[in-house]
Structures are given as structure tokens and as C-alpha cells.
UniProtKB/Swiss-Prot annotation:
Topology in membrane: Multi-pass membrane protein
UniProt protein name: Chitin synthase 8
A GO cellular-component term linked to this record: plasma membrane
Protein source organism: Gibberella zeae (strain ATCC MYA-4620 / CBS 123657 / FGSC 9075 / NRRL 31084 / PH-1)
Effect of inactivating the gene: Reduces the chitin synthase activity and subsequent chitin content. Leads to enhanced sensitivity to stress agents including acid, salt, and oxidant environments. Reduces the production of deoxinivalenol (DON) and causes much less disease on flowering wheat heads.
Subcellular location(s) of the protein: Cell membrane; Cell septum
Origin: domain of life: Eukaryota
Reactions performed catalytically: [(1->4)-N-acetyl-beta-D-glucosaminyl](n) + UDP-N-acetyl-alpha-D-glucosamine = [(1->4)-N-acetyl-beta-D-glucosaminyl](n+1) + UDP + H(+)
Length: 668
């Protein structure tokens, strides 16, 4: 039987090396160039088809990656027999039962077995794309609105009076607050002969937990804060425990040890310790391993809880506040975030320290120092009204030896004006202080403050990747104001207050990077909360109005500054004519009254003459630089609104950060 021979040596279906391969697979001996089929004297002739050698196509070169010639040095012409390999001696039988001396060797590597796409990673990418789209939509929208307002204001003078209402709304509201505060002072101090609400002193002193959440604080910062708690006056008869919660185990720049190591090795007195691999369910939904230690710090009992992973300050607050609430309620057979072993362990330590019940939680930051009467003054304030569930102190700038630095003076004036105007109006008039700063607060342990409906379902909400930007902002920033707004919405009868006599000194940013990072969080967090408060149920009318005006003022900040510049130009050109206009004259009087009140804050809010001089020096600086600062903060906040990293304000050593975030347990 004869086989049909190809008509051409230039076949398009396979190369010469492939034909040799096919011969091996069929058990045939490849034809060697120059040898005919009948010249093999060692074997009888067979009826196998004979394939003549085919020359290479023009321009073809032998590939080093060929499966036949891989690993063989020198030229290997098509049709030649493959040499014996030194790597393998695997063989197989020919048709006649004889072993073949042909072999095949390879050095390929197989790719890893993994999914073609990671659902979590793709979801994160989609979330970032959505946030970026929302960010640019917001920027373009605000730029368009402000550009249109500026153009209309310059082009059409007929809309001046409408713009006056828009521009003066915030100033008029602030002037109204000033008048209410003055009238309140006049009624309570003059007409009522210095009447003050009666302090309701309980039969037994209230029992307190002093909460100190930490992250990457230094040895000096920790000892200053703890020592200020020890030095508190007039509360010696109040049973209390210092509750320290450290978020992760990291080192900040210049730190030789982590914050947990500073506390356990150098600051706190040694005591019994215990590790819980399953401590509680964190905000990310996974179980959080914690290390606990109990003992005494300068005579005051403490409970230390060190979290293995960083989950943010809000996670620490949810853990501590919810634990105190369920401890106070003696919760049984209810679903909580806590492992029962950890809950019992900490509860027993509270009882052994004399706290069979907890009335108040006093919160502070690890970079804050309390004045010696701070806690007592907050207790006095919260006793005045049983409806009050939370009190904040007066937060002052810690100048730390640099009494005339620009950053400290500027921020000191900001702090004083905020607390001396809107927060004071909320405390004295509405009873709804919408922000209890975490660096100085006293909160009643109650269903309205620390119940599951407030903490676990709303305050502790962890944003999903497909949530809108507002939800991401509120889930990461401004936890203090968001907590208060949730209380007002769910429990409209509750009130909060401010104790101006309760002084607390806090460290403020001293450079642009840290300052802008902090103000971005404050600006985005507060304005998002104000926006949500417009629509929240249970919010009183005056607070809704304040929130609405705050949102509008923030959105048209460039237009307001442009209008102010135009007003100065009009004054320069037609000053007499402007002053004869009663509308403009009334607006200027309202504006002047607002700034006069802010100036007078320097006479009654500071504690001594040095602080008064610092306030007035900062007031002048703030008056001329705040418009530029506001624009810079607005632009920076908008262009970084999709970045939810804490940046310089929570800076850690890179290697430590990687260790802390192992397993995807990072904050954001």
C-alpha cells in the first residue's frame, strides 16, 4: 500500500519540525535527509508513508522556543533525529516491540491558579470610580453655580436686592444669635438677680468611667493626659476607672515604641493581663483580637484594651460606649458585639474597682490636657437639667510655650468664636449643642446616648463600597457632631449643653499639611452632617434653619468673597452714595454688630490677661486672613473629597502601618 505524496515541499499547515513531531507520535522513525526509504538495512521495509524533507520557507528562522529543539545547543535542521536527552530516559515501544531512542524534554512553568477577577478588588475599583465621578460632578456644579452668580451680579444690577438676602442670611442669623445671648444674660443676671438653675445633687456621688482613646501618641502626650485626669479636683468621692482603648499597635514618626508598648512597659503599673483572640465584632464585621491589662495608675484603677488592628477612633468609641451601656443594663441573652468572656472580664474589673453602676462617661483625647476643675464643672452643668444627656467643655489651644505663633493664634480665635457664639446660643437658648467634642465631653450612659439604636445601627455604620459620597464622609469623619444629631433625631426631648468653665487645652496643627488634613475632615464632615440635619426627623426648626444657611453659605463661598470685593470697590468709588442707601446701611450695621460681638468675646471668655492679648492679636490676623483661608480649605477639601485616608494627622511608620493593616484590617 502506498501513500499519496505531497505535491510541494512548501506546505502551509505545518512546519518541518512539526512533521518530525508527528512522526514520533505515530511511532515512526523520522526520515533523515539524504537517506531514502529503502536504505535502512537494520529494519525491514514497511508500508509507512514517507515524507521527504521540506526546505524552510524563505525568511523563516528556527525558533528557540520550539517544543522539539528547546534546550539543545547548536543547529537542528528540520527532519533530523532528536538526540538522546540527558534529562530524561523515558521511552516507549515501537510497533515491533523495540525501544525508541527518541525523547522529549521541556522546561515550561504553569501559571498560578487564581480567579480571573477578584470581586472585592473590582468592587473597590468601582467604588473609587464612583466617588471620583461624584467629586468632579460636585466641583463642576459648584463652580458653575458660583460662576453664574458672579456673572449675574456683575451684569444685572436688578438682582442686587435678591443677592443681598442671599449674602446676608448667615450674618443676619449670627446677629440674631448674638441678640438672644445678650437677652438671656440680661434676663438671668439682671432681671432675676443673678439667678442660676438649681444643681440637683444626688444622694450618692455619680460613678464615672474616664475614657482615653489612643492611636499613635507619644510617651509625653500620654503621660500629660493621664496626669491631668489624676489631678482633677472635687471628684475624689466619685468612684472612677480610667478606660484606655488603643486602636492598633503602631509607632508614629520619632517614636521608639508603639503606643501600646509605652503604656504597658513605661507608664502603667503592671497588673494582670489577658489576650482574647475573639474580643468583639469590629466595624468591618470581623472579630477583633484584643489584649487587656488591669491595675492602677497613681492610685486610680485602670482597664487597658489594646486592639490588634487599626479600625479607627469610631470603632473604639462604639466598643467602649456600647460596653458601658450593656454593663449598666446588666444585659442577659441579648445579641451584642462582645465576646461574653471579654464582657464578663471587663465587667468584673469594673465591679472590683467599685463601679457596680456607671452614670457618666468622660471622654478626652490623648493629646489633650484637662484643667484641674474641668470634670467637676461638667458634672455641675449636667446636674442642672435631667433632660441634658451630654455636656462639652471649653476647648482652648495649648500654646505649649509658643505664645505668639501664627497657627496657634489663628486657631485659638476660631475656637473661641465658635464656642462663644453658635455653641453658646445652642446651649443657652435651644438646648441642642450639635457637637460634643471628643477631646472634652461628659455623656450620660443611657439608652438615648449609647443604646444599640444609636450606636450599632447608626453611629457605627460602616459605609459600603457602593454608598454615595455623603455616606462615606459621615461614616469616617466628624463622629462627635454626627452622634449628637442622631440623639436629637431619635430622642427629640433630649438636650445637650456647654460648660464654659470646664477648660481643656488641646494641641493644634502647626503646618499646612496637618492643618489642611484636619480642616478637610472638619469641613466635609460638618457640612455633610448639616445637610443631613435639614431632612432628619425630630430636628427643631431653628436647627434646620441654621443647617440650611450653613450649607448654602459653604456652597457659595467664592461668590460671597467676590461680592465682598465688589462692595469694597463700590465704597471706594461711590462711598457717600452707598451710605445714603438705607438697605446697604442696614446691612453694614448688621455686619458691624456681628464683628463687634466677636471682638467683645475677648473680654469675657479668656481666663487671664495673657489670653486676652492673645485673642485680640489673633482676632486681627483672623479678620484679614480668614477669607483666603476659607477658599484654600474649600478647594483642598473638594479636590480631596474622595480620599478617606487620615493623612498626616494619623501618620505612622510605614513598616508598622503595613503590619497593622495585615489581612485587610485597615481603617479605610
Amino acid at each position: 500500500m502506498t501513500s499519496r505524496m505531497p505535491t510541494s515541499g512548501h506546505r502551509t499547515s505545518s512546519s518541518s519540525s512539526e512533521r518530525g513531531n508527528m512522526s514520533v507520535q505515530q511511532g515512526k522513525k523520522p526520515v533523515v535527509p539524504g537517506m531514502s526509504s529503502g536504505e535502512d538495512s537494520s529494519r525491514p521495509s514497511t508500508s509507512y508513508p514517507q515524507v521527504p524533507p521540506a526546505p524552510l520557507r524563505p525568511g523563516w528562522t528556527l525558533s528557540r522556543d520550539s517544543s522539539v529543539v528547546r534546550g539543545i545547543n547548536g543547529d537542528f535542521h528540520p527532519g533530523a533525529q532528536t538526540p538522546m536527552s540527558g534529562m530524561t530516559h523515558a521511552s516507549w515501544l515501537t510497533n515491533n516491540g523495540n525501544e525508541s531512542n527518541l525523547s522529549f524534554t521541556s522546561s515550561i512553568m504553569q501559571e498560578e491558579a487564581k480567579l480571573r477577577w477578584d470581586s472585592d478588588e473590582e468592587l473597590k475599583k468601582m467604588s473609587k470610580s464612583m466617588l471620583r465621578l461624584q467629586k468632579w460632578s460636585l466641583i463642576i456644579g459648584l463652580a458653575g453655580i458660583n460662576g453664574a452668580l458672579i456673572y449675574i451680579g456683575w451684569k444685572y444690577y436688578q438682582v442686587y436686592y435678591f443677592f443681598l438676602v442671599l449674602l446676608s442670611s448667615n450674618t443676619v442669623l449670627q446677629s440674631f444669635m448674638c441678640i438672644c445671648i445678650i437677652l438671656h444674660w440680661f434676663c438671668t443676671r439682671v432681671l432675676c438677680f443673678w439667678w442660676r438653675p438649681k444643681e440637683n445633687i444626688p444622694a450618692e456621688p455619680e460613678k464615672m468611667v474616664l475614657l482615653l482613646p489612643c492611636y499613635n501618641e507619644t510617651y509625653e502626650e500620654l503621660t500629660r493626659s493621664l496626669d491631668s485626669l489624676i489631678a482633677q479636683k472635687h471628684i475624689d468621692n466619685h468612684p472612677r476607672v480610667i478606660f484606655i482603648v488603643v486602636d492598633g499597635n503602631v509607632r508614629g514618626p520619632g517614636m521608639e515604641k508603639t503606643t501600646q508598648e509605652y503604656l504597658l512597659q513605661d507608664i502603667l503599673e503592671p497588673g494582670p493581663s489577658r489576650t482574647f483572640e475573639n474580643g468583639y465584632r469590629a466595624r468591618d464585621g470581623l472579630f477583633m483580637p484584643v489584649k487587656t491589662q488591669t491595675g492602677f495608675y497613681k492610685g486610680i484603677p485602670y482597664v487597658f484594651v489594646g486592639k490588634r488592628y487599626n479600625q479607627g477612633k469610631r470603632d473604639s468609641l462604639c466598643f467602649a460606649r456600647s460596653l458601658l451601656y450593656h454593663f449598666k443594663q446588666r444585659s442577659e441573652n441579648v445579641v451584642t458585639m462582645f465576646n461574653n468572656d471579654l464582657f464578663e472580664y471587663i465587667g468584673n474589673n469594673f465591679i472590683n474597682a467599685g463601679l457596680d453602676d456607671v452614670t457618666y462617661l468622660c471622654g478626652m483625647d490623648a493629646d489633650t490636657v484637662f484643667d484641674e476643675d474641668c470634670i467637676y464643672e461638667m458634672i455641675v452643668e449636667i446636674r442642672k437639667n435631667p433632660k441634658v444627656v451630654g455636656v462639652c467643655g471649653h476647648v482652648c489651644v495649648d500654646f505649649d510655650g509658643s505664645n505668639w505663633g501664627y497657627w496657634s493664634l489663628y486657631q485659638s480665635v476660631e475656637y473661641s468664636q465658635t464656642q462663644g457664639l453658635r455653641r453658646m446660643f445652642q446651649s443657652r437658648i435651644t438646648g441642642k449643642v450639635n457637637c460634643l467634642p471628643g477631646c472634652c465631653q461628659l455623656i450620660r450612659v443611657d439608652e438615648a446616648t449609647f443604646g444599640d439604636a444609636v450606636l450599632r445601627e447608626r453611629f457605627g455604620y460602616c459605609p459600603k463600597p457602593n454608598d454615595i459620597m455623603t455616606q462615606h464622609i459621615m461614616g469616617n469623619y466628624s463622629e462627635d457632631s454626627i452622634h449628637a444629631s442622631i440623639i436629637f433625631s431619635l430622642f427629640p426631648g433630649c438636650q445637650t449643653a456647654q460648660a464654659l468653665r470646664a477648660k481643656a487645652m488641646t494641641i493644634v496643627p502647626q503646618d499646612w499639611k496637618v492643618f489642611l488634613s484636619q480642616r478637610k475632615r472638619w469641613a466635609l464632615g460638618s457640612i455633610s452632617n448639616e445637610f443631613v440635619m435639614i431632612f432628619r426627623p425630630g430636628i427643631i426648626l431653628i436647627e434646620r434653619l441654621q443647617s440650611l444657611i450653613a450649607v448654602i453659605t459653604w456652597a457659595i463661598t467664592p461668590f460671597i468673597i467676590a461680592a465682598f470685593v465688589e462692595l469694597l470697590m463700590v465704597f471706594a468709588k461711590r462711598g457717600k452714595e452707598v451710605m445714603s442707601d438705607p438697605v446697604f446701611l442696614g446691612l453694614i450695621c448688621v455686619l458691624f454688630f456681628r464683628y463687634l460681638y466677636s471682638f467683645c468675646i475677648g473680654f469675657w471668655l479668656p481666663r487671664n490677661n495673657l489670653e486676652r492679648l492673645q485673642y485680640f492679636a489673633g482676632y486681627v490676623m483672623h479678620l484679614f486672613t480668614s477669607p483666603f483661608m476659607n477658599i484654600i480649605i474649600l478647594v483642598y477639601s473638594l479636590f480631596h473629597s474622595d480620599d478617606f485616608k487620615w493623612g498626616k494627622t494619623r501618620e505612622v511608620i510605614r513598616g508598622e502601618k503595613d503590619t497593622d493593616d495585615a489581612g485587610g484590617r485597615g481603617t479605610h
